[in-house]
């Protein structure tokens, strides 16, 4: 090969010159296996390998005997891309070599006759800090994750067992027939064992290794307990069984079922609920039914706060006229309510049953990331606060993995082999439940379904139930539960999920997120992430970014997304299936990104789900307003970004998934004007109380926010007053057969109220006058008179001050033991991390988890005995005192 200097870039010439000055480097040959990317075969992948490849390509140096080692990108060829890949990897946060890396291993691509040296794999070392958090280092990827699985099993074997049984549909076997419907629901929506195993075969070789290692770690702990059951968790003794070995199917099922619980559409009956609502509105208000429905289930409110900063303000007013017109067949269905009720048993009923045994899974989360231009250090700072409910033990553990090319710390869920939210030496990320339209419920004909398999569900006491699982081309039949199609009258409801099949690769996607070396690689992982989540991001290149993950298929024109889809072929997803462009932003000019489960960006969002209610009022304002004000005053420090979480958590009470923010500030002018027009001493006193209110549901500042036992009188007044107004406004229109005003969502109705108040200049307008009295009971139709009426009712119900209403508590309930810990209620996250990312990686990390790292309860005679670390974090977490976590050049002892 001759060298043509005119065709070589200055960068290549530079490295070639360095190579010529340093001399050629060769090593003696040895047998394979090999390390990919180690072109000069010295046992490591570094800059000298890129230089060696340039010399080989352009100076005709000998090629050696291991082409696979030189083939950095594993495409079967050794070319300039491999040289540039090595250089980018070492200097520019480029992608690492393909497998096998960083240790020797075989490869199915490339040739390797001999290889000089295999670097020794370091032994796995596990250390724990004073709170029991584990730090695992060294080993191959199998070894690293074997230790990961083992340490999780030591801390959370019973909790992982519960998750396994939930996700495999085996709760009734130990909890009894009350959970049989839960098991039926899981089996209907899940994959067969064969499908889970096929999904495992389709993940990457590296992902397979870590899954198998994680399982081996769990099983090592189970074997230890089999030999010496002294530390067998109390619950196994209480329920009377010993844990079975873990399998691939267990992990695959767990990643699917648990993550669906954090997809706002995956496990819901919203489209069927909406169909019932529209049908009942037609029964009660035939002239106004569609207008009412459009007001109640809007698709786009341009005034709603968004994750992505708006660029161009919306001009003019917007009404519901642009909404799709429902096709009669989408809601005028025989036995519609029965179909809805049975589907409810599959979805919401499962949540209710899990709540009954103290293991609710909740959806929420706040997060924000501030760019370096706005911080006093010049570094981006990210806060991640996923809200997943409060159980005993908590749903998550914390730890650190460092080895086999993986370097990450953060939050993990027992039974899932990955860090769901965390940080690496290059980046940090968050996760919040989002609103990608991932599910359609189809009304299919009986002749279009077929038996897929029979699932055998153990009910305990040697009793079993054989469940037929039927599917159509759209997916599993969820309503009714079909035992036989003989004499079955349609339609049936089937569940079509955009993440079906893709979600089986979640372990690979999480690995890609962890191992991403730059923003582009992390973005590629977001393209494959099969959960509808808002994800904020910061990296050492000073980037901040946001994505809404989740696959939102393009639907055919005319199909109303708020309602069930017809299974007659007229409302199919486009073929081949295409997806709407992902909502994302990088380094916005505003300098920060953040929200609290709010709308991603402009355009339609969340119309099928009444819990979304993306309107002018959304709890995200509590965080966004404070950030906007703080930025205007000057650079933000680490403490402000961290402590903002406590502020927003104290704005409202007491529903983790729905409350938050300050409704009063959105109606204070209208409500005050109404009352001042007809003042009495009692009404004036109420206004004066609210005029001096600081906007938090507990008085007294930060210390009181975490410790006070009574609610603020002002908060109590405005909360009850607004609720009473909503009742008076909507009770007559929404007094339908099954869907009363109380089932519409308080935030949804509040936004409709805002649009209807006198003088409203909001972009989205109501189609009807909701203040009109449609009932037989006399009450005002004038908005101001009704507001005053509601105030009088509220004051009468409260009685004389001070009210000093008891503050709600967060109650941690453990299996069989009931409530084991309580703390004052805050609308807070289950996990918290705040990370400042400098040019060399994180410079400061703080975090906290509820209760403690361990969830182990042991048998001590007849009584349960809690592990010393079961309550290790309570002082930190209850006090909202984020604690220091080691950055990546520190050890847990530093």
Whereabouts are the PLM-identified features?
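Second-shell loop/turn segments in exported
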Residues: 40, 72-74, 147, 193-209, ...
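Cellulosome-associated attachment modules in secreted, modular CAZymes
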Residues: 14-121
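Substrate-recognition/specificity elements adjacent to catalytic centers across diverse enzyme folds
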Residues: 120-381, 386, 728
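Terminal end segments
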Residues: 609-679, 771-894
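Glycine- and hydrophobic-rich flexible loops that cap the catalytic core of alpha/beta enzyme folds
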Residues: 403-414, 422-427, 431-568
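Hydrophobic alpha-helical segments
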Residues: 439, 531-630, 726
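Charged, long alpha-helical assembly modules
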Residues: 706-796
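Bacterial N-terminal signal peptides that target proteins for export
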Residues: 2-13
């Amino acid at each position: 090969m001759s060298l043509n200097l005119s065709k070589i870039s200055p960068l290549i010439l530079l490295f070639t010159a360095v190579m010529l000055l340093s001399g050629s480097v060769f090593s003696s040959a040895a047998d394979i296996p090999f390390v990919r990317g180690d072109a000069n075969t010295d046992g490591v992948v570094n800059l000298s390998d890129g230089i060696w490849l340039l010399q080989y390509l352009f100076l005709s140096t000998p090629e050696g005997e291991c082409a696979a080692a030189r083939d950095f990108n594993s495409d079967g060829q050794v070319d300039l891309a491999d040289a540039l890949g090595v250089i980018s990897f070492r200097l520019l946060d480029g992608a690492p070599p393909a497998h096998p890396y960083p240790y020797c291993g075989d490869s199915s691509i490339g040739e390797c006759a001999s290889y000089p040296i295999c670097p020794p794999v370091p032994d796995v070392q596990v250390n724990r800090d004073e709170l029991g958090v584990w730090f695992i280092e060294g080993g191959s990827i199998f070894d690293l994750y074997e230790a990961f699985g083992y340490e999780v099993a030591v801390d959370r074997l019973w909790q992982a067992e519960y998750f396994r049984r939930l996700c495999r549909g085996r709760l009734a076997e130990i909890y009894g027939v009350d959970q049989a419907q839960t098991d039926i629901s899981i089996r209907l929506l899940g994959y067969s064992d064969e499908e889970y195993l096929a999904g495992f075969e389709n993940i990457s070789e590296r992902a397979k290794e870590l899954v198998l290692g994680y399982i081996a770690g769990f099983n090592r702990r189970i074997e230890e307990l089999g030999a010496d059951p002294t530390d067998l968790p109390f619950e196994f003794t209480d329920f009377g069984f010993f844990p079975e070995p873990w399998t691939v199917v267990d992990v695959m099922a767990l990643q699917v079922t648990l993550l669906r619980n954090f997809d706002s559409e995956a496990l819901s009956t919203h489209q069927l609920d909406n169909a019932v609502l529209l049908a009942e509105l037609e029964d009660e208000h035939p002239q106004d039914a569609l207008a009412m429905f459009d007001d109640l289930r809007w698709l786009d409110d341009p005034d709603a706060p968004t994750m992505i900063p708006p660029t161009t303000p919306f001009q003019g007013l917007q009404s519901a006229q642009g909404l799709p017109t429902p096709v009669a067949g989408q809601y005028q269905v025989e036995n519609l309510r029965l179909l809805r009720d049975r589907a409810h048993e599959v979805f919401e009923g499962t949540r209710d049953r899990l709540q009954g045994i103290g293991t609710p899974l909740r959806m929420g989360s706040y997060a924000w990331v501030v760019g370096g231009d706005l911080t006093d250090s010049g570094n981006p700072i990210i806060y991640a606060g996923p809200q997943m409910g409060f159980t005993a033990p908590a749903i998550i553990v914390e730890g650190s993995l460092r080895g086999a090319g993986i370097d990450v710390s953060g939050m993990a869920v027992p039974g899932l082999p990955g860090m769901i939210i965390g940080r690496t030496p290059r980046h940090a990320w968050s996760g919040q439940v989002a609103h990608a339209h991932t599910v359609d419920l189809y009304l299919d004909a009986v002749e279009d379904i077929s038996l897929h398999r029979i699932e055998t569900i153990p009910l305990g006491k040697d009793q079993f139930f054989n469940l037929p699982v039927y599917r159509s081309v759209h997916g599993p039949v969820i309503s009714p539960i079909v035992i036989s199609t003989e004499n079955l009258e349609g339609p049936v409801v089937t569940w079509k999920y955009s993440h079906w099949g893709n979600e089986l690769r979640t372990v690979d996607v999480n690995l890609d997120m962890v191992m991403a070396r730059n923003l582009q690689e992390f973005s590629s992982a977001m393209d494959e992430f099969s959960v509808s989540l808002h994800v904020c991001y910061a990296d050492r290149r000073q980037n901040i970014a946001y994505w809404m993950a989740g696959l939102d298929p393009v639907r055919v024109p005319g199909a109303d997304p708020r309602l069930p889809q017809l299974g007659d072929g007229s409302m199919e997803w486009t073929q081949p299936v295409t997806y709407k462009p992902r909502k994302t932003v990088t380094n916005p000019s505003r300098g920060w990104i953040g929200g609290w489960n709010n709308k991603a960006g402009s355009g339609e969002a969340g119309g099928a789900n009444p819990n979304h209610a993306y309107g002018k009022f959304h709890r995200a304002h509590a965080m966004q307003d404070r950030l906007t004000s703080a930025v205007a005053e000057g650079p933000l420090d680490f403490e402000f970004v961290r402590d903002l979480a406590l502020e927003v958590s104290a704005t409202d009470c007491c529903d983790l998934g729905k409350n938050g923010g300050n409704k009063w500030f959105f109606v204070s002018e209208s409500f005050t004007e109404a009352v001042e027009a007809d003042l009495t001493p009692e009404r004036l006193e109420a206004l004066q109380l609210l005029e001096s209110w600081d906007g938090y549901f507990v008085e007294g500042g930060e210390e009181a926010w975490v410790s006070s036992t009574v609610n603020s009188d002002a908060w109590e007044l405005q909360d009850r007053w607004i609720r009473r107004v909503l009742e008076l406004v909507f009770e007559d229109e929404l007094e339908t057969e099954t869907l009363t005003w109380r089932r519409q969502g308080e935030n949804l109705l509040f936004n409709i109220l805002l649009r209807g108040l006198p003088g409203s200049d909001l972009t989205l307008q109501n189609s009807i006058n909701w203040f009109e009295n449609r009932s037989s009971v006399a009450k005002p139709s004038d908005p101001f008179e009704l507001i005053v009426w509601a105030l009088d009712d509220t004051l009468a119900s409260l009685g004389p001050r001070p009210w000093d209403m008891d503050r709600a508590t967060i109650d941690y309930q453990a299996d069989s033991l009931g409530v084991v810990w309580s703390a004052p209620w805050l609308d807070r996250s289950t996990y918290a991390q705040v990370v400042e990312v400098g040019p060399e990686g994180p410079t400061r990390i703080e975090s906290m988890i509820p209760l403690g790292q361990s969830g182990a309860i042991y048998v001590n005679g007849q009584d349960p005995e809690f592990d010393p670390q079961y309550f290790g974090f309570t002082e930190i977490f209850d006090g909202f005192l984020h604690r220091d976590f080691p950055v990546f050049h520190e050890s847990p002892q530093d």
